[in-house]
Regions:
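Leucine-rich repeat
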Residues: 1-494
């Protein structure tokens, strides 16, 4: 199809009049628009369908295939795709992606992975049995030089239905070499020789190990050896799957004598025993770390001396301006946010304690030990369950929670806790009124009524503060789920 001079004079312009480089930019813009949409829905399993363009005409097909890198072209297939179907295409990068069927045929030989190992760029699979993982692992005993992303996970319920459920990556995987690998994600998958494997994966940017099974446990000093060479690592997650996955405290090894410096690390997430993390932190230095998320299980005495020292030398998360304390069923979560946090980049420190019968004193211990800058927090938010009762009923124990927050100016409390906190504050009379929250200027209570026992108790606290020259304004907190320290449009003064 072509446009005539008369068409141009009349303003009839077709897309075929555009030069190749302009068409290429249009294709690229279409791809980037698709990528932006995927970022919104957070789906890595969808990709730009470039093959639709090549079926429009021969010219478009030629333009697309001349710029595979610019358009980020790749062939997406599942592990059982016949090699013949791949060979009819140009030699583009290959992405192997599939949720493997439970009843995999015996000839499910992953032919693509074997025949085109030099082109496989990404593998993203979910396994439902050990035989499936073994089948793929046996096909991947050689190095995959183009592989940059590897993600293995298993059906989390596989151990309930399959006696043969020990999903583990065997020795010799990828020829024990992954020099180009940038992202490794394992979920419910054991990799016993991971520390040794990491020694060759020096290009890693993201390492995510979630729900590590018992048989995938590795001691802190072993993983430190592997981490020491990952100078490009920015995101690190180490999570043990269940409380029974954690080793006995007495069996843990002494802190490592050397330190692994991770110069690029900005995000670290851990789930496991406090002793394990304490030993790990004793051997790590992270000068750029600004986001730390920690979850402890079933420990009433936290062994965190090394972790506390680590926190003191991690200066990028030592300047929070607000803290969030969330009491939920069997969970206590304490989170501090830096003044520069955004909805897309929440930087700061988060500590979650999961236990069946945790003590309030443990929370105070964690606060004092891990939040050396808790004394400068100016905005404190207290959340909790709407239906489950708290493990303690003594209102006075709330004073223990508030005691470390000596710089708080604004306190936000949900309705369910107001009836417990108000009587505690009411007991602060005379000189004691300065012992807890001495700098508080505003108290926001969700669902506060003009009159009632809560209002009466708070009124006595306000009067006591007024007598010592430190008045407190009482306001109603309308919506605790969306209110923030920089946006108080949801708070209304009674």
């Amino acid at each position: 199809m072509s446009a005539t001079t008369a068409d141009c004079a009349a303003g009839h312009v077709t897309i075929n009049m555009l030069p190749d480089d302009i068409l290429l930019l249009i294709f690229h813009f279409d791809r980037m628009t698709h990528v932006d949409k995927l970022a919104v829905v957070n789906s890595a399993r969808l990709r730009w369908r470039w093959h639709r363009l090549i079926h429009v005409c021969q010219r478009w097909r030629s333009i697309v295939f001349r710029s595979p890198k610019f358009l980020d072209l790749a062939l997406i297939c599942d592990p059982s795709t016949p090699v013949e179907l791949i060979d009819i295409w140009p030699p583009l990068p290959i992405i192997i992606r599939d949720r493997i069927n439970r009843h995999m045929p015996k000839d499910y030989a992953f032919q693509v992975a074997i025949a085109h190992l030099n082109r496989v760029r990404q593998i993203d699979l979910c396994f439902k049995s050990r035989s499936q993982l073994q089948r793929l692992a046996s096909a991947m005993q050689k190095e995959f030089p183009a592989l940059i992303h590897l993600s293995f996970d298993s059906d989390k319920f596989v151990d309930e239905f399959d006696d043969d459920s020990a999903l583990a990556i065997p020795d010799g995987f990828l020829g024990e070499s992954a020099s180009c690998l940038q992202s490794l994600n394992l979920d419910f998958i054991a990799f016993p020789v991971l520390p040794k494997f990491l020694l060759s994966a020096t290009a890693l940017v993201r390492l995510t190990l979630q729900n590590i099974p018992d048989y995938g446990y590795f001691p802190p000093e072993a993983i430190l050896t592997g981490l020491a060479v990952l100078v490009n690592l920015k995101y690190l997650t180490i999570g043990f799957g269940r409380p029974r996955s954690f080793p006995d405290q007495e069996s843990c090894h002494p802190p490592p004598p050397t330190c692994a410096v991770l110069p690029a690390l900005t995000f670290f997430k851990f789930q496991g025993a406090s002793k394990y993390l304490d030993e790990l932190m004793a051997g790590i230095d992270t000068p750029l770390l600004d986001s730390l998320y920690i979850t402890f299980f079933n420990h009433f005495i936290f062994d965190i001396s090394q972790l506390a020292q680590f926190m003191r030398r991690t200066t990028r998360i030592q300047t929070p301006n607000e803290a969030h304390v969330d009491f939920n069923y069997r969970i206590v979560k304490v989170e501090s946010l830096s003044p520069t946090w955004t909805l897309s980049k929440k930087s700061g420190l988060s500590i979650t304690c999961v236990a069946f019968n945790w003590e309030l004193s443990n929370l105070v211990q964690v606060l004092m030990s891990l939040f050396p800058s808790i004394y400068i927090v100016e905005h404190l938010y207290v959340y909790g369950p709407r239906s489950f009762p708290l493990p303690w009923q003594d209102p006075m124990q709330w004073l223990e929670v508030f005691h470390p927050f000596t710089a708080v100016k604004k306190l936000y409390v949900i309705k369910e806790f107001a009836q417990h906190i108000a009587p505690a504050l009411q007991e602060l009379v005379g000189e004691r009124v300065k012992d807890v929250l001495p700098t508080m200027e505003s108290l926001f209570l969700e669902g506060l009524l003009p009159s009632g026992p809560v209002q009466e108790a708070i009124g006595q606290f306000v009067a006591a503060r007024q007598l010592i020259g430190h008045p407190v304004a009482i306001s109603r907190w309308k919506n605790y789920q969306v209110a923030t320290s920089f946006d108080e449009q949801y708070c209304g003064v009674i």
